[in-house]
Amino acid sequence: MNLPLLATEGFGLNLNLFETNVLNWAVVVFGLYKFLPSFLGKMLQKRREGILLELKDAEDRLLKATQALEKAKTDLSLAEEKASQIKADSLKRSESIRMESEKKAIEEMARIKQSAISDESSEASRAISQLRKEAVELAIKKALDSLPNRLDQTTQENLVTQSINNIEMN
C-alpha cells in the first residue's frame, strides 16, 4: 500500500511496521537501554571520582589555607605585640638618654662654672700676690732710701753683730 502523500489528501497514519522503521528504532532503543548504562556509567563513575578527588583536594587546600591564615594571624598579633614592646622600649631608652644628656649638660655647666670661679679666684690670688710683691718692693725701696739717713755708725755695727749672732744660732 504505497500511496503517495498529497497535500490534498490530508494527514494520514502509516501503520506498516517495516516501512516506518519502528523496528529499527526499537533495536536502537533496546541497544541503548542495554549497553549505554554500563558505558555511560563507567564514564560517569570516572567523572564522579575525578570530581570527588578534586573536591577533596580543594577541601585539603582550603584546610591548609585556613591553617596558614590562622598561623599568619597569630604571627601578626605576635609581631604587633613585639612592635609595641620595641616601641615602648625605645621610648624608655630615648627618655633615659635624654635624662642622661641633661644630667651631663648640667654637670658640664657646673664644671665650667666651677672652672670660671677657680680661674677667677686664681686670677684674684695672682693679682693679690702681685700687689703684695709690689708693696714689698716698694717698702724695701722706701726702707733702703730712708736707711742711710737713719743709720749711724753704732747702729750699723749693732745690726751687723746681731745678724751674725742670728746666723750662728741657726
Swiss-Prot record:
Asked if the Swiss-Prot or TrEMBL record annotates the protein with the keyword Transmembrane, the reply is: yes
According to its UniProt record, where is this protein located?
A: Cellular thylakoid membrane
Which superkingdom is the protein from? Bacteria
Q: Which CDD domains match?
A: ATP-synt_Fo_b
Membrane topology note: Single-pass membrane protein
Q: Does the keyword Endoplasmic reticulum apply?
A: no
Q: Which GO terms describe its molecular function?
A: proton-transporting ATP synthase activity, rotational mechanism
Q: What is its main location?
A: membrane
Q: Which GO terms describe its cellular component?
A: plasma membrane-derived thylakoid membrane; proton-transporting ATP synthase complex
Which residues span the membrane? 15-37
Q: Which family does it belong to?
A: Belongs to the ATPase B chain family.
Q: Subunit structure, briefly?
A: F-type ATPases have 2 components, F(1) - the catalytic core - and F(0) - the membrane proton channel. F(1) has five subunits: alpha(3), beta(3), gamma(1), delta(1), epsilon(1). F(0) has four main subunits: a(1), b(1), b'(1) and c(10-14). The alpha and beta chains form an alternating ring which encloses part of the gamma chain. F(1) is attached to F(0) by a central stalk formed by the gamma and epsilon chains, while a peripheral stalk is formed by the delta, b and b' chains.
* NCBIfam families referenced in this protein's UniProt entry, alphabetically: PRK07352.1
**Its biological function?**
F(1)F(0) ATP synthase produces ATP from ADP in the presence of a proton or sodium gradient. F-type ATPases consist of two structural domains, F(1) containing the extramembraneous catalytic core and F(0) containing the membrane proton channel, linked together by a central stalk and a peripheral stalk. During catalysis, ATP synthesis in the catalytic domain of F(1) is coupled via a rotary mechanism of the central stalk subunits to proton translocation.
Q: Which HAMAP family match?
A: ATP_synth_b_bprime
Q: Which PANTHER family match?
A: ATP SYNTHASE SUBUNIT B, CHLOROPLASTIC
- What is the name of the protein in this document? ATP synthase subunit b
Originating organism:
Prochlorococcus marinus (strain MIT 9515)
